[in-house]
Design a protein with these regions (language model features):
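Bacterial Sec-dependent N-terminal signal peptides
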Residues: 1-26
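Juxtacatalytic substrate-recognition/specificity segment
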Residues: 18-159
Length: 163
């Protein structure tokens, strides 16, 4: 009986890992990136989306103000926020290796603590996603010192609570 259960569990796990197999990240075009700076963020954008980049920088600063108060933490260095004009362009990102399905509204990359966001046309939803992803970025800064490279090189000691 136990052997059947183990065999069934093994095949179920293989099915879960097989969902992303064969999904390639195709990059249809090259992006001409520009960026603007705010006190705590470097916002990268492309095409003629300066207004979207300004909105992103302002929304990020507003969100950071709330997050830093709630978590009692200030960022050690500016966080890069990469903004794509559409979800189709967002799916081409090479910041993370994972295929970005339609349901993903943004991602915070741990290695360099970068936030990657697609703009879907709704400023209200975009502001919400910016806030959500910046919570991840601030927590990464709290735990890993801004990037995981410091832990790998041994420069940062983890002081995780032992609850």
């Amino acid at each position: 009986m136990n052997h059947r259960f183990i065999l069934l569990a093994f095949f179920c796990i293989q099915i879960v890992f097989g969902q992303s197999f064969g999904k390639n990240k195709v990059q249809y075009r090259d992006f001409d990136w520009k960026f603007i700076k705010s006190p705590h963020f470097d916002v990268y954008y492309y095409a003629n989306e300066f207004e979207l980049a300004e909105f992103t920088a302002n929304a990020a600063e507003e969100a950071y103000e709330q997050i830093s108060i709630h978590l009692r933490w200030t960022l050690k260095k500016p966080v890069s926020v990469i903004v794509y004009n559409s979800h189709n362009d967002f799916q081409q990102t090479n910041v993370v290796d994972t295929y970005m399905s339609e349901g993903i509204g943004g991602v915070t990359e741990l290695f360099k603590n970068r936030v990657v966001l697609p703009f879907d046309g709704s400023y209200k939803e975009f502001r919400h996603v910016i806030h959500h992803e910046l919570v991840h970025a601030v927590i990464n800064d709290m735990i890993y010192g801004g990037n995981i490279q410091g832990i790998i090189s041994g420069r940062i000691r983890l002081n995780i609570p032992l609850w």
